[in-house]
A protein has these predicted regions:
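Juxtamembrane transmembrane-helix boundary signature
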Residues: 45-71, 233-237, 241
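Hydrophobic, membrane-embedded alpha-helices of multi-pass small-molecule transporters
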Residues: 5-24, 43, 90-94, 98, ...
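Hydrophobic alpha-helical segments and their helix-loop junctions in multi-pass secondary transporters
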Residues: 21, 91, 95, 128, ...
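TM-loop-TM module centered on a large, flexible mid-protein loop between adjacent transmembrane helices
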Residues: 71-80, 230-276, 317, 322-334
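Transmembrane alpha-helical segments of multi-pass small-molecule transport proteins
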Residues: 9-17, 44-49, 86-95, 111-135, ...
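Transmembrane-helix boundary/entry motifs in multi-pass membrane transporters
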Residues: 2-5, 35-39, 64-93, 111-117, ...
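Membrane-water interface regions at transmembrane-helix termini and the short interhelical loops
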Residues: 34, 61, 101-111, 125-146, ...
Length: 355
């Protein structure tokens, strides 16, 4: 894979983006994987392949074009006509997911610290705005800094329930409601598409800022491996306690609190941090699509953007997830298929290819 310090930083930043809108709360894993028993791990591997290999290809394209936003990469993948369609669909729905995460941060502040939802969302909005004033290298560093702590916490929870969980691996299929291979594969594809769509614009921009294609590709692949391991561990933890947490709003927090309330508190802080990661990455990508980063127009745009995001967050966390997530999974799968077609076509034509 050829990992170096820069590639590891890219990998952690990539993971930091996708877990915020993906599986940090555990609710998403409960919907897309856990109910399908051991078949769900096929879906986990499919999702990991999408994040790793397809992310690698896209990061290398971003490096080749020295991209600051996803526009040139979409043109390379789809051609000029269709790229505009996906450009506008992607950019506005990614902004919608950022709004969803702001709403989610308000709910998390309220549930864990009894802070009013509106105030929690406002705190997150202000922190995001202040971070967007920093240069891009500092933003990438901010995106990756929490990922190692998330890895440690997820491993701790998974190991604990490996030895103390009510349900063993051999009992999983007899406990969950649907042991369906088809659903495990299908929802793994959709979830992989969702996570990839969330990380797409950011991994393009990170790739554009990388020193070499080999480095950006290795970083994205490394991020995909970390993502797959974390996803499998969280899924396993939820399955070992499925009857107890199947109706929980934030299942991973319930698992952590069952071990020790202090672990629950630490996980709450980490969850807020990964939500911050996702909101930051998506808002930067949205602003960079319409303005030159750090120009006068950029500074005006991010003020308007963050005010709009805060106001729209009052629609509510659950309602926003129901509308956006499955649609974004389908959009992401269109991009994944297009990247694969481009990859194999250029390989087959024996052309010198970007990725």
């Amino acid at each position: 894979m050829g990992l170096n310090k820069e590639a590891i930083k890219i990998g952690f930043a990539y993971v930091g983006i996708v877990v915020g809108a993906g599986f940090s709360t555990g609710q998403e894993v409960m919907q897309f994987f856990t109910p399908f028993g051991l078949w769900s791990y096929i879906g986990v591997l499919i999702s990991g392949f999408i994040l790793g290999f397809i992310g690698r290809q896209v990061a290398k394209i971003g490096t080749a074009f020295e991209a600051t936003n996803h526009e040139s990469t979409l043109q390379y993948i789809f051609g000029e006509k269709f790229s505009k369609v996906f450009d506008y669909i992607l950019v506005f729905f990614l902004f919608g997911i950022a709004v969803t995460m702001i709403a989610g941060s308000g709910s998390t502040f309220n549930q864990s610290f009894n802070i009013p939802t509106w105030l929690g969302a406002l705190i997150m909005t202000i922190i995001i705005y202040l971070t967007l004033l920093l240069d891009f290298n500092k933003i990438v560093r901010a995106l990756g800094i929490v990922t190692p702590f998330l890895i440690i916490m997820v491993i701790l929870i998974a190991v604990y329930y490996l030895f103390t969980g009510d349900i063993s691996i051999s009992q999983v299929n007899s406990t969950v409601p649907e042991t369906s291979a088809w659903k495990g594969i299908f929802w793994g594809l959709v979830y992989g598409g969702l996570a990839f769509a969330v990380g797409f614009s950011t991994v393009v921009a990170i790739g554009g800022d990388a020193s070499k294609r080999r480095v950006s590709g290795a970083g994205a692949m490394f991020g995909g491996v970390i993502y797959t391991i974390l996803l499998a561990l969280i899924n396993f933890s939820l399955q070992t306690e499925y009857p107890k947490i199947k109706n929980a709003d934030i299942p991973t927090l319930d698992l952590a609190n069952s071990i020790n309330p202090w672990i629950g508190l630490v996980l709450t802080i980490i969850m807020l941090a990964v939500m911050y990661n996702t909101i930051l990455g998506l808002c930067y990508s949205f602003a960079a699509r319409f303005t030159e980063p750090y120009s006068k127009k950029y500074h005006i745009f991010i003020i308007i953007m963050m005010i709009a995001a805060y106001v729209l967050s009052f629609v509510g966390f659950a309602d926003l997830i129901n509308v956006l997530y499955k649609f974004m999974g389908v959009v992401g799968m269109f991009i994944v298929v297009a990247v694969l077609i481009k990859y194999f076509k250029r390989k087959n034509d024996d052309e010198k290819h970007i990725a």
